């Protein structure tokens, strides 16, 4: 006699089916997995500038902003990760980016916040780190939601924030977070949170990444400040069959449209029409912090397929943009 095996919800196939048609911005486009998709550009252009290969090569000259640049990691980020204590070099979150900025005379402050703490707790730590590093100077920040909260609600008194540049930040939440919570189920969530807390993993940030929380709670209570300049970038790519983002990309694409595997372009946009600097094409969420670029550039050299995105060139160009804005 055969016994039925109950499959936990978290292991089931996604409830969001991969539809051959995806709707966004009042347009339909065909997305059959059996044939190449038409260009995504018509949809992306509705959001603003589409960036293809402007950051494939590091230029000889970049202007340096007048004031220090703060780099602060996002969810599950870190300053330096050490797998073997002092015996092996640590893995840096901003690998190569900080060094490239510093080499061109740009003062860089690296801020470290709790990897998965609540936005409020991370913002408090961010303010303390910047205060120590800035020593009273005005700063330009490249970060995300924590910085928005810090600027709007904490209002630091010992330093002034001139600008905030966000890169693929989920300003309107992420349907990936919605999907994960839906799969876990409300009845099992306390058990998972308890287990994570036992491992000293803070859980405050997870529920704050849902679309409902961001649009109904966070954004209405965290308004932009008039004397701060807000800039933003989004990213979009089509994952390969081997990509770790294949499932999350599918969920996002079916609900929000073009995305980088974790955050959609529509959720990334912030700062109004003039503040949104463009959508990086063919770039995943990990590409944005230079984690995957080294392997991809090496593979490109071997196969002859030239990479179109270099994270270091991108961050240098952000610094150049800040300089041209008088910051």
Residue spans of the language-model regions?
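Short amphipathic alpha-helices and their capping/turn segments at secondary-structure boundaries
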Residues: 43, 48-64
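Serine-dependent carboxylesterase/thioesterase catalytic core
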Residues: 73, 124-222, 260
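Hydrophobic/aromatic beta-strand patches that form the interior of the parallel beta-sheet core
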Residues: 70, 109, 165, 231-233, ...
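Short aromatic-enriched loop/helix-cap "lid" or pocket-rim segments at secondary-structure transitions
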Residues: 82-84, 173-180, 241-246
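Glycine-rich, phosphate-binding/catalytic loops in enzymes
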Residues: 86-89, 151-156, 180-184, 249, ...
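C-terminal catalytic-base region of ester-bond hydrolases, centering on the histidine
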Residues: 226-327
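Active-site catalytic motif of lipid deacylating hydrolases and related acyltransferases
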Residues: 64-139
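N-terminal mitochondrial targeting presequence
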Residues: 1-41
């Amino acid at each position: 006699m055969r016994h039925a095996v109950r499959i936990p919800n978290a292991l089931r196939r996604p409830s969001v089916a991969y539809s051959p048609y995806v709707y966004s911005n009042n347009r339909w486009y065909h997305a059959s997995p059996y044939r190449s998709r038409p260009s995504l550009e018509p949809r992306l252009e509705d959001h603003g500038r589409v960036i293809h290969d402007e950051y494939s090569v590091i230029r000889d000259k970049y202007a340096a902003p007048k004031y220090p640049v703060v780099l602060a990691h996002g969810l599950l980020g870190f300053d330096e990760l050490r797998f073997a204590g002092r015996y092996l070099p640590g893995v840096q979150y901003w690998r190569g980016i900080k060094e490239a900025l510093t080499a061109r005379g740009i003062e860089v402050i690296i801020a470290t916040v709790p990897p998965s703490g609540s936005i409020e707790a991370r913002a408090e730590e961010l303010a303390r780190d910047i205060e120590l590093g800035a020593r009273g100077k005005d700063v330009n920040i490249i970060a995300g939601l924590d910085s928005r909260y810090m600027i709007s609600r904490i209002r630091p008194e010992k330093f002034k924030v001139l600008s905030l540049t966000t890169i693929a930040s989920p300003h309107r939440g992420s349907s990936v977070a919605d999907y994960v919570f839906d799969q876990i189920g409300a009845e099992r969530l306390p058990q998972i949170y308890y287990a994570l807390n036992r491992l000293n993993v803070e859980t405050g940030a997870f529920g704050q990444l849902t679309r409902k929380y961001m649009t109904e709670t966070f954004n209405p209570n965290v308004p932009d400040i008039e004397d701060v300049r807000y800039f933003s970038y989004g990213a979009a790519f089509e994952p390969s069959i081997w990509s770790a983002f294949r499932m999350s990309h599918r969920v996002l694409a079916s609900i929000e449209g073009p995305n980088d595997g974790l955050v959609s372009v529509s959720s990334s946009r912030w700062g109004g029409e003039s503040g949104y600097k463009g959508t990086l094409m063919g770039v995943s969420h990990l590409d944005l912090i230079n984690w995957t670029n080294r392997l991809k550039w090496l593979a490109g050299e071997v196969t002859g397929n030239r990479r179109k995105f270099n994270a270091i060139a991108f961050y240098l160009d952000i610094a150049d943009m800040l300089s041209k804005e008088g910051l």
